Amino acid sequence: MHSNSTIEKSVNSLADSLVIRQLNTMDYSQVWHAMKDFTDNRDDTTADELWLVEHPAVFTQGQAGKAEHLLVPGDIEVVKVDRGGQVTYHGPGQLVVYVMINLRRKKIGVRQLVTLIENSIVSALTDYDIAAYAKADAPGVYVDEKKIASLGLRVRKGCSFHGLAMNVNMDLSPFLRINPCGYAGLEMVQTADLQGPKDTASASTALVKHLINLLKANNVSHQVGLPNENNKYHE
């Protein structure tokens, strides 16, 4: 038998734990299915995770997505997904961070998590003297009214998945084939053009330290590759 104090101590310890998982470049659908499996299989003994990845070119359309926002997808694959929001683009040179957090254990709501993620991005860009900001009416992070980072989350069983995408050093032209996040004419910008990080590795280092800080994670571990299904994602 575990005493209540032992269980509480274990839960508090897990609330402080965070796994940073480097996936390098990986197909969008493969990662999407893996994060759904991770979320479906996790329980109160599963540590929270951040997955860092770049995707080959793909448009993803959220649950609110309307076909008219896909202007000219052309030869780029379109994947309909289960996150909030409209259509966005992922491609090489963009840092994507998937945020798998047990919100009940952290005692935060999804709106608080959105704000935390936005603040982490703003802080990372501030380190490079980039004047970035969030908007109350349009999730994401902006510089001079141009969007530098997009955000889309889903919550299942009290746990978040999906996450953020920050433009680092990429071909931005595919964004012209869509209305990004459902906003016609919304301009996109990237860190490499603003004296910020020139590659996703540098951007990742800058961003992750602020995510760790704002998530109050004191027990951080680093892993490479998708979780091993045999361990059921438990610590």
From Swiss-Prot:
It catalyses: octanoyl-[ACP] + L-lysyl-[protein] = N(6)-octanoyl-L-lysyl-[protein] + holo-[ACP] + H(+). It is found in: Cytoplasm. The keyword Transit peptide does not apply. One of its GO terms (molecular function) is lipoyl(octanoyl) transferase activity. Its EC number is 2.3.1.181. The active site is at 181 (acyl-thioester intermediate). CDD domains: LipB. Keywords: Acyltransferase, Cytoplasm, Transferase. The keyword Nucleotide-binding does not apply. GO terms for cellular component: cytoplasm. The record marks 147 as: Lowers pKa of active site Cys. Coiled coil: none annotated. Substrate binds at residues 83-90, 150-152, 163-165. One of its GO terms (biological process) is protein modification process. Pathway: Protein modification; protein lipoylation via endogenous pathway; protein N(6)-(lipoyl)lysine from octanoyl-[acyl-carrier-protein]: step 1/2. Gene3D superfamilies: Bira Bifunctional Protein, Domain 2 (3.30.930.10). Residues 44-231 form the BPL/LPL catalytic domain. Its main location: cytoplasm. InterPro entries: aa-tRNA-synth_II/BPL/LPL, BPL_LPL_catalytic, Octanoyltransferase, Octanoyltransferase_CS. It is an enzyme of class 2 (transferase). Catalyzes the transfer of endogenously produced octanoic acid from octanoyl-acyl-carrier-protein onto the lipoyl domains of lipoate-dependent enzymes. Lipoyl-ACP can also act as a substrate although octanoyl-ACP is likely to be the physiological substrate. HAMAP family: LipB (MF_00013). In the reaction, the free carboxyl group of octanoic acid is attached via an amide linkage to the epsilon-amino group of a specific lysine residue of lipoyl domains of lipoate-dependent enzymes. Belongs to the LipB family. This is Octanoyltransferase. It comes from Colwellia psychrerythraea (strain 34H / ATCC BAA-681). The lineage of its organism: Bacteria, Pseudomonadati, Pseudomonadota, Gammaproteobacteria, Alteromonadales. The gene is lipB.
